[in-house]
Structures are given as C-alpha cells and as structure tokens.
Amino acid sequence: MRTLLTILTVGSLAAHAPEDPSDLLQHVKFQSSNFENILTWDSGPEGTPDTVYSIEYKTYGERDWVAKKGCQRITRKSCNLTVETGNLTELYYARVTAVSAGGRSATKMTDRFSSLQHTTLKPPDVTCISKVRSIQMIVHPTPTPIRAGDGHRLTLEDIFHDLFYHLELQVNRTYQMHLGGKQREYEFFGLTPDTEFLGTIMICVPTWAKESAPYMCRVKTLPDRTWTYSFSGAFLFSMGFLVAVLCYLSYRYVTKPPAPPNSLNVQRVLTFQPLRFIQEHVLIPVFDLSGPSSLAQPVQYSQIRVSGPREPAGAPQRHSLSEITYLGQPDISILQPSNVPPPQILSPLSYAPNAAPEVGPPSYAPQVTPEAQFPFYAPQAISKVQPSSYAPQATPDSWPPSYGVCMEGSGKDSPTGTLSSPKHLRPKGQLQKEPPAGSCMLGGLSLQEVTSLAMEESQEAKSLHQPLGICTDRTSDPNVLHSGEEGTPQYLKGQLPLLSSVQIEGHPMSLPLQPPSRPCSPSDQGPSPWGLLESLVCPKDEAKSPAPETSDLEQPTELDSLFRGLALTVQWES
C-alpha cells in the first residue's frame, strides 16, 4: 500500500513542476551601438520555427512591466527599445516570453542595462583626400538617435564631452605618423609622391574607457606633375605666340598695298637723272631800251658756256641732253619793261669765272671756275676774287617767270646767218632801247648790266606776261634768219618763262661769248612783253664759239656776281 501512495505522489509532483526555459529561450540581452538599444535573444534546443515571442520592459525601481508595442507574439528574435530606453540617466530591464506550438512557454529577463555604460562606438565617418605630398583626413560628426529637449538629434561629441580622435598613418607597416585632437580636419605633410599609405582613425572616450572600432582607408599620394605643367604651360605659350605672329603676318599681308606694275615705274622708263650738273650754257639777254615803252622790248641772247666739275680720267660718259639740273628763280623777275625814254649808260659789270671744286654744297655757294671770255671781247687777265654768298631779293610787281631752251640738232651743218640789222652790235657798256618789237639781238651787254638796269627800272614796270624764246640748231625761220657764221645757234620765236635753270655737262672748257648771228623774233602776233630767260638746256657737244672780239672789253667779275644779279641758286650733286 505504501508503495502505491509513493508512486502517486511523485507523479503528481512531476505534473506540477515548471518547465526549464533554456529549452525554448536563451541569450536574452541588450545590444547598444551609438545609443541605439536593440533587445536580442536566441531560441533554445527545443525551439521551433512556429514559436512566438512577446517583449516587456520596465525602468529600474518599478514593479510593473510594460509590454512593448509592436513586439508581441512575433517570430523574429530582436526588438528595438531605443525610444523606451532613451533616458541616459536611467537603468532598464527587459524580458522575453516564448510560447511553443505545443503550448509550452518560457520567460527570461535581461540584466540591468545602462546606455552610457553599455553602448559601443561605431567607426567614425572619415573622408581621406590624397595630394602630391600630403594626405588630408576630414572626420564627419557621428549622429545618435538620442534627441534633446528641443527635438534635435545629438551627436557623440554632444554626449561625450571628452571625446577625441586618434589618427595613424603608416607605410608598409614600418613608417607611422600619429595625429590626435578634437578638431575634425587633419593633414599629414611631407609624404612621398605616388606612394600608398594606410590610415586609421578611432574615436576615444577616456571617461568611459571607450574606443571605437578603427576606420581604415588606403590612400595613394598623387604623382608629381610639376614638370608636366611647366612643359604644358611653355607649349601653350609658344603656340599662343605662334598664333599671334601668324595673325600679325596675315594682317600685314592683307593690309599691305599692292606693288605698282612695272609700267608705272618711272625710274626704269626715264633715262635722265635730275639734279646732276654737266656742262653749262647760259644765254645772256641783251635789251634795247630805246624803243617806245608801250611796246614789248625784244631780247637778244649771248651764249656762254661754263665748264662743270672735272671728271676723273676713264670715267664713263654721262648722258648728254637727258641728264639735266635746274636752278630755279621762280618768283624774282630780272628785267621789267620801263617807260624811261632816254637810254641809260650803265657801268659794265664784268663776269669772271674761276676754277671750281668738283662738288659743291647743296645750296648755292659761288665756286672758283676756269677762266672764260665773253663773246665780242678781247681776252683779259682774270682776277681771282673771293666768292660772295648769294642772297635773293624779292622785287615788287614781279612778273611770271619764263625760260629758254637751247637744243642741239643738225644746225652745225646748216648755213650760218648774220644779224639782220647792224644795230644788233653795239659797244660794250651801252644799253639802248630798240623800237621794233620783233627783233632780238645778241650784243656786248653783260649779264650784270642787264641785271642792274632791271633793278633800277623795277619800280616803274607793269606786270606783263613774259615772252618765251627757244634756241635751236635744228630748224631756222627764213623770215627772221639770214646768212651768218657757221655753227652759230638759231633762234625760233616762241614764249618761254624766265631763266631759272642751267645745264652743265661734263667737260671743262673756256667761257667765250658766242654771239648769235640770227635774230630771234619773240612772236609774230604783234607786240608782246619782253622778258628774260629763266631756264636753259643745251647739249655738251655744241660747236665751240668763235674767237672773241677784241673791242670794248668788259672788266670780268666772279661767277657769283652773275647768279647774284639773276637771283639764281646753283645746286651741285656729287
């Protein structure tokens, strides 16, 4: 009987004994990282997939448990209690109840939990920037789910006031550099270009003895491309300079005026060369002032040949007629018509050329020339006098200038002529007016006499048009010319401006005066104003003048007296 009662008692006690929770539920605990609190657990050996779990929590010191909404009869094995355990100064408890499909249940509670103490720190968020010789590391702030009283989320720096960062940089695990501090930006200097480094960054909280997991980054410094940049800059500068030069050359080529055609090149077409002195021929006008003042007075010309600068032996022959030089006197008239009826006897002014040097100054300076003789005069000894400078004088009521041309033709072989009237020849030193206006005589009146007479009568003269006369050896006027000496130049009627230039050809020679044997009629159209030649051109090979006459010799003067009287300017070209 006693044995039966013992079996019944043990069976009833076994039926009322609690189940072991380790068979259905185990490892219930809080896992907190950066103050994110997660409750986790594992199922026991007898747990099945259809086992459900329910979670409850309470603050330390309270008796009642609070069921967690959203974590009742769940099959997952975790529940987030961050909000329910967000107070950093409180301690919390949590428990899990597991119920199997067979009706078995098990409950297990966590240990006391403090977020400040039990939370762990995650690795920081860092940005590594590689440079040529340095590596820069920027630590970003780590946010937490904890909210402040105003609702904004706190960071680790806000929660742990003694938090600081520890940085380490190493190369091949041999060379290490360390930096630390509370700032968020760090940079390692003095690194080798094009080298790989391993960086490690950790968060340290000394008060709670916490260290975060290290953040690791592999960074390679940049290669040194300074020479590449220098070369590129030099290349770009060279290309820019080349483009600028090409643009400038293109602009110059486009804006350059086109070259004139050869047909417009006058220097190739013309054969004469201006301002080149060769042998000089001068026509000295002789006036007859005895005629009525209302008629223009005829002009006769005495030809003078003056030798130019000597050329060295063997020098090439210069161009004869085409190479000329003009000595201008455009504004000063030498002779003007006069109404003074009585003839005036002027003291003769002699012309004395002297030897001249080869080259003269640009403006006229009288030079010493070889001795010369006037026509119709006996040779005389020439006195050497210092040349005087020429100063042109302007006269009132100046006439328009005129000129004369002596041209070479076939007149050397033509019959010579004589003056149509004997009054063409007169004693030296006498100047008479001739009534006829159509005759032109060559006589013994020197150029200085004519100049003196013109200067005295300049106040009484009227402004009249000057007649132009042309002296030529090519043709002759049968109405004007008569037979005379052979080789004398012939004179054609025409109108020329005043004498303003002298042509000098190459060979030096004496200065005899050659009287023309044929009269020159200025015009056939009635009275015309008389004037003085201003320009003269003669060839160098003109026939030499006959021997000068011996009667009534004039006292010779210097060459500068002639040009001073005529107000001419002589320019020499080397």
UniProtKB/Swiss-Prot annotation:
One of its GO terms (molecular function) is interleukin-20 binding. Keywords: Cell membrane, Disulfide bond, Glycoprotein, Membrane, Phosphoprotein, Receptor, Repeat, Signal, Transmembrane, Transmembrane helix, Ubl conjugation. Residues 1-15 form the signal peptide. Coiled coil: none annotated. Residues 16-228 are extracellular. GO terms for biological process: cytokine-mediated signaling pathway; defense response to Gram-negative bacterium; negative regulation of inflammatory response. GO terms for cellular component: plasma membrane. The keyword Metal-binding does not apply. PROSITE patterns: FN3. It is found in: Cell membrane. Glycans are attached at residues 80, 172. Disulfide bonds join 71-79, 128-217. Induction: By IFNG/IFN-gamma in keratinocytes. It comes from the Eukaryota. Component of the receptor for IL20, IL22 and IL24. Component of IL22 receptor formed by IL22RA1 and IL10RB enabling IL22 signaling via JAK/STAT pathways. IL22 also induces activation of MAPK1/MAPK3 and Akt kinases pathways. Component of one of the receptor for IL20 and IL24 formed by IL22RA1 and IL20RB also signaling through STATs activation. Mediates IL24 antiangiogenic activity as well as IL24 inhibitory effect on endothelial cell tube formation and differentiation. PANTHER family: INTERFERON/INTERLEUKIN RECEPTOR, INTERLEUKIN-22 RECEPTOR SUBUNIT ALPHA-1. This is Interleukin-22 receptor subunit alpha-1. It comes from Homo sapiens (Human). The gene is IL22RA1.
